Every structure is written in C-alpha cells, then in structure tokens.
C-alpha cells in the first residue's frame, strides 16, 4: 500500500502552523533548551546543503522538546551585507553605484522582504520546527541597534580602533574584507625568472607577480644561502623602472623556491607585508582599490591586474630581462565569496583589536562541548594562525552603519549616544557637536560593518528579539557547517568573550558539506546541482531528512539515490505497519494493560524497552545517525518482520477461542510499540510520525506527537525474552530453508522438518505453522537449530 507523501506532509505543515505547535513558552532556565539557529541569507534559493545541515539542528530540537524541554528555536534571516547587495544587483540590474544610499537601501529591504516570505515556505517544507510566525532579520532597526550598541561597547573597552593600516581588499567586490573571509585556493600561474642587476652582475629573482615590479622596495635572500652572502647590504637595480633597492637577508626566505632570491613589493602577499613591517621598508602602491594599476606601475598605468601581468612580461622579454618562465600550481589567498585573488592596501579602516586575546579564545573554545570533538582542533588551528586584528569596515551601501561622524575641523571621532541608536550617519545629521573643539562641521562615516560583525551577535539578537537575553544566555546549542568555523563560530566566541567574558553556548554541533554521488563539489559550471524541490517532489521531505541522518555528525555526505529511496521505503513501511495493526484491531478500542501475559507480547515490550534506551543514549550524545540505525534495525527486522507476523496467528487463534483478553492485550502491545517507534522516528521523520500518531487511537494523546513525551517506559520480561528470542531463531532457520529451496516466504509448504529444543518448538507449533504457512511440522531434538522444507 502506497501513500501520497507530499499531500500528507503539506497537511501536517498546515496543522502545526494552525495549532501553534512550535510556539515557545518561557520557563525556568533548567527547563529551557535554547538554540542559536543559523540565519540563512536571502540571496537565492534553498539548496541540498540546507536540507542536510539544518535538519541536524532540528533533530535535536524535536528530541529535546519531547524530553520535556521548552525549546527556544528561533528563526532569522541574515539579510544585510554583500550577499544581499549582489542578489539585488542580479535581480534588478541596478548597481549600488547607480543609486543613492537611501534608494538602494530601500530597494534591498523591499527585495529581501519578498525573498524572505517565499523562502519561509521552503524551510517549513523540509520540516523545520522553528517558530516562523515571529522571526528576526539582521537588517531590522532592532538588530542594527544591537550591533551599533556592541560597537560602542568595543569603544568603551578600548577594543576597536581606526587606523591607516594594511587591509585586505577584493578587487572584484570592491570592498575590504577580513582574514576570516579569505580562503586558500590552488591556481595555475607562471613563475617568471627576471634579471635584476647588481652593478655588472645579474641577480635573478623568480616571481608570480611581475606586474608588481613598480612596487618593489627590496630584494631578500636567506642569510645562510652562500650564493648571495656577498650581495647582502648592496643595492640591486629594478629592470624597466631603474630604481635601486637594498639586498637584505631574512631567515624566512625559502632557498629552494625559484632562485632563492625574492623581491618584496608593497604588497604582493602576506610575506611582503610581514617583511615590510619588520624592516620598516618604503611604501609604493601600484594597484588601486578597483584593481587598476597606478602611476607607480609606470607603463602599466590604468591596466587591470591580469592585463598588466601580460604586458610587463612582454616588456621584460623585449628588454632581455626574462630568463625563463615555468608553469606552476600554487596556493593563493582569495575572497571566499567570489574566488578573486586578494590584494593588500594601506588605508583607514576600523578594526576590532583581538590578537592579544588568542589564548583566551582558545580557553573559551575548550569550555564548549564540540560535536564532533575533533572540530575543536580546526577552531584552535584557526585562532593560532591569526595574524591581524579583525577588519570590520566595508565599502558598501547595505549594511550596519558605523554610529560615527568625524570633525572636519579637528579630525576628532564623534560617536552617537546609545539613546540615538539605531542611527545612519550617512542619512541622519548628528545631534551633538564635536566634544573636542565644539564644531558642528561633522562628516559621516560612509563605510558599513562587515556582515560577520553583526552575525557574530546572533545569540544576543535572537534572545533580545523576544526579551530573553538575560534569562537564557549563554544558549545551549549552536549548529553550523564546518566551512564557517573560522567565520561564525570563531567570531561569536570572540565577541562573547570581549563583551560578556562568557561563552555564547554550551555546545556547538558541526555539520559537513554535501557533494554529488562522485564526491565532487556541486556547482553550476559542473552541471551537477541537485534541485531540492525536485527531490522533495520525488521522495518527500521525510526521505531527505532520513538521508541527512545517514552520516555521523561532522562528516561530509554524497547525494545517492539509494539513501533517499531507503527513507521513502521507511515512510511507506511505517504507514503499512500501522494499517496492518488497524486491520488486526478491527473495531476494538485500545485497552491499556499495566502488565501483559502472552510471551510474544512480553518479548516485544522487552525489546522495545531495550532499543528505546539505546536510542535515547545515542540522542543524548548527539549521535543521531547511530540512533536511527538502531531504530531501523528494530523496526524493520524485529517489529515488522517478526512481531507483526507472529501476532497474526495469535489474534486469529485467540479470536476463534473467544479469548478476547489476549486479543486486546496484543492489539494494545502492537499499538504501544508502533507508537514508540513513531515517537523515536519523530525527530528525524516528523511528517510520517505525526500521521501515525494522529491515527493511533491511543488514550492520552496530545495535540501533536512533537509535544508528547519521549518513550522511556521500562518493561523487562527476561523469562519471555529468552524463550521468544529462541523461537525467532527457529523462524529465521525456516525462512532460510525456504530460501534455499527457492520457495518464497509467503508460499505454503507441505512439510517443515525442524531440529532444536523440541519442547519449546512444540509449544509454538501453531504460531510457526500459521506464520510461516506450513501444513505439517516434524520436530526433533537437536543441539543447534536447523530446518528443512519440502514444498
């Protein structure tokens, strides 16, 4: 018997919404389980990654709710910043530079709100149990106020500064970015060997950035490199440009890369920046903020970086300065959003000062439970590798404005008062004079804050939205992907330490990435994108959630049809198991039994009690995959394949004999275990669980399975368990014998010859004959169970 899965799932979405099943009711802290939900961006559609990682959080939310906790599971959208700007530009064709600030902000808000409404339906469709009727957005006045208030808190604590300092910039996105927004990417390029000169002697250096020649301020060699020891302290002439630079020594120079001599430019990479700082070298900028060559680049002025690279090599070749070129593959720092190699500039930017707190960040990270534990190592590696303070300035329109003006007369920085927040200095005039010179000639800060500067405050934003920050902070759980440990996990831990000297949550649960069936990362260019809605239409949301539970927490996953098929088959199996119980039950009402007498019923209740205890332990340990695997085995093999088949002849025989107590007891037991199975599956497959629950006429039913209690009743009948477990082994032997004789399990056979414990097998002769369709059984004593069938 099949079921229209999509129709069934949509029915329960409407029901949960109408009944306010997931509304949070405040309670004492020890009765609350508070979750820091990842607020997705509004820039685009849901994808398979969402249907993998978000259910991981929902599994725990639903489980904790059934364990009696008041679950604070808020929803939000991260709708400020670069992703939204790019989405708006893509949707409308309007660039930020084509519009004024107010108009572009209005456009961003309008499109974001429209996108949020349609996206909400998708999140409901995959069964998320957040409270969607009241959600926060990071662009709201409330969120902006909190973000600006925390900025002023940083000012008071001496943890924020504005300085002319190195900043990382993306030429494509035309904005500064922070170290947490960079990623290393392997790229193919040319290593060009260029001759400098030291008097009449050539000095060959190898570089992947020949377009930076105009910014060369020194040549470095390793002090232990005998080839160049006599050149240290002398000057080299830069080809084409003709200027002279010092030859210096530093142990960081790799003698085995290229020629062992490297030029230092301001700035080609992190190494250039480090040596520039260390030796107080001159500053020459040959690339502007838009990724174009400046006057310092001489004949390359006005060219893009890629065009300049080609042009300078041509010029160097013509001048006889190129020794050779090699094709290499090397690691390049790129902007994680667009993949463009980053550039380093010197400009006035806002920074959060935190490099001196690295040890404290490590310590606080260790106060948090990491699931899986090894993900903490990734966090610590990131913290230990930090080299710069956190740059939080962004040259964009749409974002949280800095609550700052500058005095045009004396240069003083003027901060807004807390009572004025939220404020946008680009639009609003200051309410006060310069507190240094009294001037009213104040100009606004036009930059906005990095998106992560606000996203790092989500525990505060979400809890404050409901007026619960002081009551439930720190929260209990953060769920997120491992790809943003350096973004969201780190920045949230850092801000919590700086502002509150606390941890933001007691546990963080990390999910992996989604790949195609061949282990390839999914992308439009590869043509391997899988549409989430087509998967839901084909298999149902419960099947997608089942798939999400097939790997251990933190592991990556592949999209394999067999996993979705297994999920759908489980949904149908549950539906059909319930239908079979309905048939066996007939018109009878379910009677409750504090104790049961029939050995088969005593056996299944014992097995049920044991498996529920195992599943509970796994769920308490955040081992959802192990819990579901154990449940699958019990449901398919123990409950369906054995128990439900065993009770058919039991009920038939008892009904014929007028033994209605046994009939009622068996109907109760089957319904009770089916209910427990539905409850145990409920966190993972909430739709079919609700369908089963609402159609089991079991006394004491609540408004939804998802607010009912978790199965934890302990009934153990050791006598019956041993006896019936032995009979199950006999059943397995007879089924195997049928298979060996090439007879299907459902086909009737004339004779079955069975060896084993004769007295016990004899006791269950009628059950075995009826269940396995055997006309005649020959039973004999034997040390081991064995069976043969004769069709």
UniProtKB/Swiss-Prot annotation:
Residues spanned by motif 'KMSKS' region: 521-525
Keyword ATP-binding in annotation: yes
Compartmental location: Cytoplasm
Keyword annotations of the record: Aminoacyl-tRNA synthetase, ATP-binding, Cytoplasm, Ligase, Nucleotide-binding, Protein biosynthesis
Extent of motif 'HIGH' region: 40-50
Main location: cytoplasm
SUPFAM superfamilies: Anticodon-binding domain of a subclass of class I aminoacyl-tRNA synthetases (SSF47323), Nucleotidylyl transferase (SSF52374), ValRS/IleRS/LeuRS editing domain (SSF50677)
UniProt binding sites for ATP: 524
CDD domains given in the database record: Anticodon_Ia_Val, ValRS_core
GO cellular component, one term: cytosol
EC number(s) given by UniProt: 6.1.1.9
UniProt catalytic activity: tRNA(Val) + L-valine + ATP = L-valyl-tRNA(Val) + AMP + diphosphate
Enzyme class: ligase
A single BP term in Gene Ontology: valyl-tRNA aminoacylation
Stored Pfam families: Anticodon_1, tRNA-synt_1
Recorded family membership: Belongs to the class-I aminoacyl-tRNA synthetase family. ValS type 2 subfamily.
NCBIfam families: PRK13208.1 (NF009687), valS (TIGR00422)
Name of the molecule in the record: Valine--tRNA ligase
The organism of origin for this protein: Thermoplasma acidophilum (strain ATCC 25905 / DSM 1728 / JCM 9062 / NBRC 15155 / AMRC-C165)
């Amino acid at each position: 018997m099949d079921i229209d899965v999509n129709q069934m799932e949509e029915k329960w979405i409407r029901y949960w919404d109408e009944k306010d099943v997931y509304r949070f009711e405040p309670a004492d802290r020890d009765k609350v389980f508070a979750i820091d939900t990842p607020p997705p961006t509004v820039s685009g559609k849901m994808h398979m990654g969402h249907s993998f990682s978000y259910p991981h959080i929902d599994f725990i939310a639903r489980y904790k709710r059934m364990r009696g906790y008041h679950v604070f599971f808020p929803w939000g959208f991260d709708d400020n910043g670069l992703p939204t700007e790019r989405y708006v530009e893509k949707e409308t064709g309007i660039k930020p530079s084509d519009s004024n600030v107010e108009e572009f902000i209005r456009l961003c808000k309008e499109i974001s709100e429209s996108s949020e409404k349609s996206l909400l339906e998708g999140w409901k469709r995959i069964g998320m149990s957040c409270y969607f009727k009241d959600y926060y957005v990071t662009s709201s006045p409330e969120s902006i106020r909190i973000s600006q208030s925390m900025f002023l808190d940083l000012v008071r604590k001496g943890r924020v500064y504005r300085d002319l300092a190195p900043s990382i910039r993306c030429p494509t996105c035309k904005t500064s970015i922070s170290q947490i927004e960079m990623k290393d990417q392997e790229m193919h390029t040319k290593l060009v060997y260029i001759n400098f000169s030291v008097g009449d002697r050539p000095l060959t250096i190898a570089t992947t950035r020949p377009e930076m020649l105009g910014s060369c301020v020194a040549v470095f060699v390793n002090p232990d490199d005998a080839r160049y020891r006599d050149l240290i302290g002398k000057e080299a002439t830069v080809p084409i440009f003709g200027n002279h630079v010092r030859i210096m020594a530093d142990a960081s120079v790799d003698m085995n890369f290229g020629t062992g001599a490297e030029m230092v430019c301001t700035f080609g990479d992190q190494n250039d920046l480090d040596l520039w700082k260390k030796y107080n070298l001159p500053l020459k900028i040959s690339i502007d903020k838009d990724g174009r060559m400046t006057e310092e680049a001489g004949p390359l002025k006005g060219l893009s970086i890629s065009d300049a690279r080609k042009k300078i090599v041509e010029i160097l070749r013509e001048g006889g300065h190129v020794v050779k070129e090699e094709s290499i593959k090397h690691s390049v720092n790129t902007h994680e959003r667009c993949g463009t190699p980053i550039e380093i500039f010197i400009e006035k930017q806002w920074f959060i000062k935190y490099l001196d707190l690295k040890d404290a960040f490590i310590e606080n990270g260790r106060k948090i439970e990491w699931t899986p534990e090894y993900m903490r190592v990734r966090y610590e590696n990131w913290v230990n590798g930090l080299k710069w303070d956190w740059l939080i300035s962004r040259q964009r329109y749409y974002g949280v404005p800095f609550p700052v003006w500058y005095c045009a007369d004396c240069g003083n920085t003027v901060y807004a008062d807390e009572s004025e927040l939220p404020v946008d200095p680009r639009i609003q005039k200051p309410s006060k004079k310069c507190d240094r010179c009294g001037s009213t000639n104040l100009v606004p800060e036009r930059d906005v804050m990095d998106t992560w500067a606000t996203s790092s405050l989500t525990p505060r934003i979400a809890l404050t939205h409901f007026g619960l920050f002081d009551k439930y902070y720190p929260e209990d759980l953060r769920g997120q992907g491992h790809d943003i440990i350096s973004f969201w996990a780190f920045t949230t831990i850092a801000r919590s330490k700086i502002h509150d000297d606390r941890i933001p949550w007691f546990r963080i649960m990390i999910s992996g990435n989604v790949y195609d069936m061949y282990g390839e990362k999914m992308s439009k260019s590869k043509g391997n994108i899988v549409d989430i809605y087509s998967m839901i239409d084909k298999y149902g949301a419960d099947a997608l959630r089942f798939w999400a539970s097939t790997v251990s927490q933190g592991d990556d996953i592949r999209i394999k049809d067999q996993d979705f098929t297994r999920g759908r088959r489980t949904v149908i199996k549950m539906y059909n198991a319930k239908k079979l119980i309905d048939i066996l039950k007939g018109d009878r009402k379910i009677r409750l039994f504090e104790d049961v007498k029939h050995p088969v019923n005593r056996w299944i209740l014992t097995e049920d009690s044991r498996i529920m205890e195992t599943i509970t332990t796994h769920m308490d340990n955040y081992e959802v995959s192990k819990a579901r695997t154990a449940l699958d085995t019990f449901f398919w093999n123990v409950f369906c394949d054995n128990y439900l088949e065993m009770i058919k002849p039991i009920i038939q025989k008892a009904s014929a004999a007028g033994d209605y107590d046994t009939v009622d007891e068996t109907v109760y037991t089957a319904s009770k275990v089916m209910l427990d199975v539905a409850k145990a599956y409920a966190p993972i497959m909430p739709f079919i669980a609700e369908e089963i629950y609402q159609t089991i006429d079991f006394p004491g039913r609540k408004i939804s399975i998802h607010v009912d209690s978790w199965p934890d009743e302990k009934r153990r009948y050791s006598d019956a368990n041993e006896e019936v477990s032995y009979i199950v082994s006999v059943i397995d032997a007879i089924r195997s014998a049928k298979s060996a004789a090439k007879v299907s399990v459902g086909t009737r056979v004339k004779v079955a010859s069975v060896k084993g414990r004769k007295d016990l097998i004899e006791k269950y002769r009628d059950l075995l004959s009826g269940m396995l369709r055997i006309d005649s059984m020959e039973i004999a004593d034997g040390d081991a169970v064995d069976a043969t069938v004769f069709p």
